[in-house]
Amino acid sequence: SKDIKKKIDSFLRSLKARNEKESISALDISDKKKCFVIKIKNKYKNYYFEEIGGTFFTFIKKYKNIKEIDLLADSLTESKEKLPKLFSEFIFGFNLKSYTFTKYKTLNKEKINKKINLKVISSFKEKIKNEYKYYNAIKEGVFLSRDLVSEPPNVLNPKRYTEEIKKLTKLGLKVEILNEAKLKKLGMYSLLGVGQ
């Protein structure tokens, strides 16, 4: 609506006038809606958008009732060719930061596993979606690794670990499991010592 646009424009002007140092600022639009403004540097290095995505997730965590965020991708003044990659990196950083290992926690699971739906609004939505497939595959691998290293050793022993890794063959990954005899033949005695 015109009122909301007016409120946001006024907020942006005040941020500019104050020369706000913070990279993320929030504005209450109504009781149920907030507007977040993310300042992007003119010159940035690799992984900058990934870092900003993670920073944004940390920032919004303090707002307990947020369930969905509309991300206005076209508001960034970057070339049309760069936008899909930059926003994919932002979403990737946001999702990586959202990881939690709560399998053994007795707290309210619904509360600690609260997901925030990130909805991208852009004329390049399909390109962002296609670009993100690459980052999503990495994210899934990172989350699997984090899950495995977070398991206690009495749960994730060598046998159980091989069972988990074998599941990756469904994705087309070739997996070779080395038994004790093969490990000895290859001289992997340190590994055998750890797995006892």
Segments predicted by a language model, with ranges:
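Short amphipathic alpha-helical segment within the helicase RecA-like ATPase core
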Residues: 1-196
